[in-house]
Regions:
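Conserved GNAT acetyl-CoA-binding A-motif
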Residues: 143-144, 171-184
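Conserved active-site alpha-helix within GNAT-family acetyltransferase domains
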Residues: 174-175, 185-203, 208
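Conserved acetyl-CoA-binding loop-helix of GNAT-fold acetyltransferases
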Residues: 148-151, 157-170
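Conserved N-terminal entry element of GNAT/NAT acetyltransferase domains
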Residues: 1-18, 22, 26
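A short helix-loop-beta-strand connector motif used in the catalytic cores of GNAT acetyltransferases and
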Residues: 48-74, 141, 145
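Conserved acyl-donor/pantetheine-binding loop and adjacent beta-alpha core of acyl/acetyltransferases
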Residues: 81-150, 156
Length: 221
């Protein structure tokens, strides 16, 4: 998608991808799913800085993999970023396919013990980690999936989020497309409902205190 006010990051724009990964990764230290995932490193004494480094690398993998298919974006003033794609632009690939073929930035910085702990934690969280469901719900029809977004911490309260999401929703409305995302907190659910999203379903696992709220925004919501 080419969206006004947003930079569609190319795979060779490494500085912009790193900037987007920093914005989202640093914000995701507060995001419930990510916080639970990296809590697996607490037994190694991992501090916030180490967890942020890992989240940045994880996001850099995901953004770089999706940038090949117009799936990574920055506001032109670089105060907010999002990962998301128009399903038809994946050219038959899936979100899972792209994540499985990421460049390996995360793997390069992990110790063997960290890698094992995070892999085991992700497997344990599988029931509340369903991130490739929208294409099934849409019966392979076109739609927009937003897999991550965030505002730079230093730019919060300045309207960056609204300036980022308005072009996405305008495109969705113009082309009669559903938009999808997931969230894991009441606060985020309320914010997304303010933008016109509604709950599709909620996934839970008794082993974890968080729930996955899968949400849709219908055209002209």
């Amino acid at each position: 998608m080419n969206l006004p006010g947003l930079i569609t990051i190319r795979p060779d724009q490494h500085d912009l991808l790193a900037k987007a990964a920093q914005i989202i990764g640093d914000s995701f230290i507060e995001e419930p799913w990510s916080a639970v995932w990296v809590s697996a490193l607490d037994k190694f004494g991992a501090d916030t800085a180490r967890k942020q480094e890992i989240l940045r690398a994880s996001l850099l993998d995901e953004l770089t993999a999706h940038a090949r298919y117009q799936g990574a974006y920055l506001l032109e003033d670089e105060t907010a970023a999002f990962g998301g794609y128009l399903y038809s632009e994946l050219e038959g690939r899936t979100h899972t396919d792209l994540d499985a073929n990421a460049p390996g930035f995360l793997d390069a910085i992990l110790t063997p013990d960290e890698r094992k702990a995070l892999t085991e934690q992700a497997a344990a969280m599988e029931r509340i980690s369903q991130f490739d469901w929208t294409r099934v719900r849409e019966n392979e029809g076109d739609h927009i999936y937003l897999y991550s977004w965030a505002v730079d911490k230093n730019a919060r309260g300045k309207g960056s989020l609204r300036r980022m999401v308005e072009p996405i929703f305008a495109y969705a409305d113009e082309h009669n497309l559903n938009c999808y995302l997931e969230c894991y907190s009441d606060h985020l659910q309320s914010m997304y409902e303010h933008f016109g999203f509604e709950i599709v379903d909620v996934l839970s696992d008794p082993a974890f205190d968080i729930t996955e709220r899968r949400m849709v925004r219908r055209p002209n919501a």
